[in-house]
Amino acid sequence: MASELDGLPVIATRREEAEGFLQGLVSKSLGWARKYSLFTYPFVTACCGMEYMTMASARYDSDRFGAAMPRFSPRQADLLMVVGTVNCKQAPILQRIYEQMADPKWVMAFGVCASSGGFYDNYATVQGIDRIIPVDVYVPGCPPRPEQVLDGIMLLQKKIQNQSHKLIDRKPLPVIAGGPGR
């Protein structure tokens, strides 16, 4: 009997349909909220830092896009902006900062040096931070214009909104045989 039913589609019950519908609404709502509340952690190492400060100034106003308040603790941030060149001695530090960030977390490679090592093609420079940590958005330029950075933030916002977000990740509790009282 079970082998006859293996190829048939499983029909969802009303409760499963309701839970799926509710999860879809929660996911869309969380995606919308998260895309406008990015808490950045700037990892600034080189000359692109000047353009990072320009991007955060009143003229370009990154606050409009929800990325205004830089955090100086990775535990309070969800967007790591790697700004500039990363050398091999800094690589473990960058990886540790990434691991300290709470989930969900995103990474932006700010400038050519962070994206591909730039013109520092030598043994001491990491040829792109994607060799150390996963990168969500690459912003080109040496240094990138503030408009390019804001475009990168908008691309990241689209990515965040289209991701699946869960309010609570429920996992079944383990059953312990012969526990207390048995």
Curated annotation (Swiss-Prot):
Q: Does the keyword NAD apply?
A: yes
Q: Which cofactor does it need?
A: [4Fe-4S] cluster
> How is it placed in the membrane, per its record?
Peripheral membrane protein
User: Where is the protein found, in the record's own terms?
Assistant: Cell inner membrane
An annotated GO cellular component of this protein is: plasma membrane
UniProt cross-references to PROSITE patterns, sorted A to Z: COMPLEX1_20K
Listed NCBIfam families? nuoB_fam (TIGR01957), PRK06411.1 (NF005012), PRK14817.1 (NF011392)
Q: Which protein are we looking at?
A: NADH-quinone oxidoreductase subunit B 1
**Organism the protein comes from:** Anaeromyxobacter dehalogenans (strain 2CP-C)
The gene that this protein is the product of is nuoB1
